[in-house]
């Protein structure tokens, strides 16, 4: 079985601890204890006009609207584009931007990122801590977030992980790297040889496909000889790697072949290495759809009796979402005090 862990959850962990580094520890599920933290978490009650802020160079680029699957993502996306292009541009596109999420939730890191960006654009003289958070959000967190959503197949998992390292090397300070590398190391599941080799056999460059096919075939021979259950260990990372194949040591004797390729013979792999044609199951490198499916299944089982009724409930729910998009929340209909 191919082990797949959510990359969107992975990128939240370094961001969480970099927020803690600059804003301090949380004082609850919706706030921080520091002055800046309180200003960010209470932003809905203290919104001000956008000032002539200093634009921040970032990596967030234009994405298709279909990738922006909820209001939080749309808000973060348009605000990021505005900060990169300046106050006049941001004011022009604010009509495309949904309202600020009504409550800050530190368990949903896209939400604090949006709050920090909104705080920045209304602050004439932002602190260095706030500036650094904006640099990290625009050059590391949000670019990775949208890249993972765009190329969501598991075959891209190792490439996204390597990109996370590369972006961090370019925009993190040495102190920030010291804080963040720990969480790269303990969550390097997508840098496991099985994920790296899967990305390699699907790579557009023939030389990389051929190299990975040879490693997979050799690993298969060794696995057949031992006939043991493979131990899955988080690999040691090379943070100075020039490409994704170098971020771990693929010459180690404990390298194992990707389970997702078990139905492909050695000859199939050699052919794939030559022409690049491969069909794999649609498995994502993030778990957003899984989490939504779990929620829908739980709701259906609570409201219906029997598997057939529960299944019909889920199908109706999916059809309703497609035909009647959800755009309103309870707060839109309840007068604010």
Q: What feature does the model see in each segment?
A:
Residues 1-337:
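Alpha-helical structural modules in large enzymes and assemblies
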